[in-house]
Regions:
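Short cysteine/histidine-rich metal-coordination sites, predominantly Zn2+-binding motifs
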Residues: 21-28
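Polybasic (Lys/Arg-rich)
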Residues: 302-407
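Surface-exposed, Lys/Arg-rich phosphate-binding patches that contact polyanionic backbones
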Residues: 55-82, 157-181
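Short, basic amphipathic alpha-helical segments that act as recognition/interaction helices
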Residues: 31-34, 77-107, 174-200
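Core beta-strand-centered patch of the WYL/Sm-like small regulatory domain
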Residues: 192-316
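Short Cys/His-rich "knuckle" micro-motifs
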Residues: 14-19
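Short Lys/Arg-rich basic patches
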Residues: 1-6, 10, 33-66, 108-162
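Bulky hydrophobic/aromatic content
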Residues: 117-146, 150, 159-222
Length: 407
């Protein structure tokens, strides 16, 4: 026997256990069964969806779009983010993974509901679980409504399968409470990942193809950046650069020697993977990587994956003034990882810098007169030629330009 209060007259009513169970069962379940059968909101068939985001999320989307090359020329700005293309890439490459994560969360909620409210039917349990998950982002949703930044997502050939699945299946079947909030939750989950993992998601097919050829030990043809020509490359390893948060393909390329035209050489190279073209195919001119090249590339992983060494133990010696020593803490971009002081000669501190010589040259050029690279006659000559050109520019050409400018 159970005693309950009448919701209309507030009088107490005694009920048998089976009667009480039927009332509670009806109260718990009828609402959700009705919502399941008669959804109030439905997909209208529109090929454009409004996604409400806050300023921070909008900024993250735009930054990653530009970083990963999803740009278009708009009003003379060649680096304007192409949001629709970038969001489509997230949808295509992250949708399934995100759904698995969401399903795992929902299953935990469903199990908890079943354990604590056994009278709930499956349809009610699933509906309540969906409502709870939607409520997890309530504060974020309010923040979005207050900001009122709208991203218009257009249905395209690239995203249409995922677009329709979200609109027709998820929303119409009440598995999500709001299309906009679903996209926002997917974006939130995506941006919780470090940049190098986001890059692997956006370029999923490219990474899959590269890993396949690396595992098989096959030479490939690929394009890089805006170069229309294919490069003949033996892919060795995919690595991450901690300071830049990018992924790099360490490889050996068979190419013409720039210093000796007509002479074909192989050289160690590091390519940023997001700049590699989408088309990667088996080479019709295969070659093998040497053990020395493997060792050089392995050392590059710890020294600096963004710039490949040409030989094991590669390093330079550089003399820095006191100002130059201070610049080591001020200039970060392209900075070598391992820089070791070995000797003091008068006002100069001598450093041994491990890793790619090309990277070291590029880095220490910015130190001007406060850095002198030692024991490298070729670099010395190139610097002297460059310095002489600068002297000539200021001794003669600058005066000529100033005269013509003032005419």
């Amino acid at each position: 026997m159970a005693t309950i209060k009448c919701p209309y007259c507030s009088s107490k009513i005694k009920l048998e256990r089976f009667q009480y169970k039927d009332i509670v069962d009806s109260e718990l379940n009828d609402k959700y069964v009705e919502e399941k059968q008669n959804p109030q909101n439905y997909y209208s068939g529109n090929d454009t969806t409004n996604i409400y985001v806050d300023e921070e999320m909008c900024k993250k989307l735009d930054q990653d779009a530009v970083e990963f090359g999803f740009v278009r020329n708009k009003n003379g700005n060649a680096h304007s983010p192409n949001r629709n293309a970038f969001i489509s890439a997230i949808m295509t490459n992250y949708y399934d993974e995100f759904n698995v994560e969401e399903e795992q969360k929902k299953n935990v909620i469903v199990d908890t509901l079943k354990q604590n409210i056994p009278l709930l039917k499956d349809v009610s349990t699933n509906r309540i679980a969906s409502c709870i998950m939607a409520g997890m982002d309530t504060l974020a949703s309010e923040k979005i409504r207050n900001k009122k930044i709208i991203i218009k997502l257009k249905k395209t050939n690239m995203n249409e399968d995922i677009y329709d699945d979200i609109q027709y299946n998820k929303f119409f079947n009440n598995s999500i409470s709001s299309i906009s909030e679903f996209y926002y939750s997917m974006f939130q989950s995506f941006f919780k990942l470090p940049q190098y993992l986001r890059e692997q998601i956006i370029f999923k097919k490219k990474f899959k193809d590269l890993r396949k050829y690396i595992e098989e030990g096959k030479t490939i043809h690929m394009k890089y950046k805006k170069d229309k020509n294919y490069r003949n490359v033996f892919p060795y390893k995919i690595v991450q650069s901690v300071e830049e948060s990018h992924n790099y393909l360490l490889c050996v390329e068979k190419t013409e020697d720039r210093n000796n035209p007509g002479n074909i050489i192989t050289m160690c190279i590091s390519y940023r993977i997001d700049n590699i073209g989408d088309t990667i195919k088996l080479s019709n001119s295969p070659f093998e990587i040497t053990e020395i090249q493997k060792q050089a590339l392995d050392e590059s992983i710890s020294n600096s994956p963004s710039s490949a060494q040409q030989e094991p133990g590669e390093h330079i010696l550089v003399a820095l003034t006191s100002t130059g020593v201070g610049l080591l803490d001020a200039i970060y971009t392209f900075k070598p990882t391992h820089i070791e002081p070995i000797k003091q000669i008068r006002e100069y501190t001598i450093y041994k810098v491990y890793g790619s010589k090309f990277q070291s040259y590029t880095y220490f050029k910015r130190f001007g007169e406060h850095a002198i690279i030692l024991n490298d006659n070729s670099f010395k000559q190139s610097q002297l030629i460059s310095a002489q050109k600068i002297i000539n520019n200021y001794n003669s050409i600058s005066s000529q330009l100033e005269e013509e400018l003032n005419q």
